[in-house]
UniProtKB/Swiss-Prot annotation:
RNaseP catalyzes the removal of the 5'-leader sequence from pre-tRNA to produce the mature 5'-terminus. It can also cleave other RNA substrates such as 4.5S RNA. The protein component plays an auxiliary but essential role in vivo by binding to the 5'-leader sequence and broadening the substrate specificity of the ribozyme. Pfam families: Ribonuclease_P. The keyword RNA-binding applies. It comes from the Bacteria. The keyword RNA-binding applies. InterPro entries: Ribosomal_Su5_D2-typ_SF, Ribsml_uS5_D2-typ_fold_subgr, RNase_P. It catalyses: Endonucleolytic cleavage of RNA, removing 5'-extranucleotides from tRNA precursor. Keywords: Endonuclease, Hydrolase, Nuclease, RNA-binding, tRNA processing. One of its GO terms (cellular component) is ribonuclease P complex. This is Ribonuclease P protein component.
Amino acid sequence: MKENRIRKNAEFRRVYRKGKSFSNRLLVLYVYKNYILKDINRIGISVSKKVGKSVVRSRVKRLIGESYRLNSSNLKKGHDFVIIARTACNGKRYSDIEDSIKNLFNKAGLVIYDEKNIT
């Protein structure tokens, strides 16, 4: 998954400016269709200093990344995602973050439904 990350500032800006946003209480999701890399999804995670000290921010990033990793096989391919953590993420459990991410991907219409992964 490390090679499927958005790292450059210009890539983040493109997703912010041209992408579509979806939000809930814990997270904000920006989605941009990537016409060059059609067979993979890329993800960028942003957690501001408002969320907490570095230990808290790192934990939130790890929880978001792990939740995405476990659910990425159920998503349509060829998109860039930027997930922004809101201050309400501070102190939340993994299950709360995972439910929030699933909710956002459902709102965006990016979940592939089949018999195995009905949520």
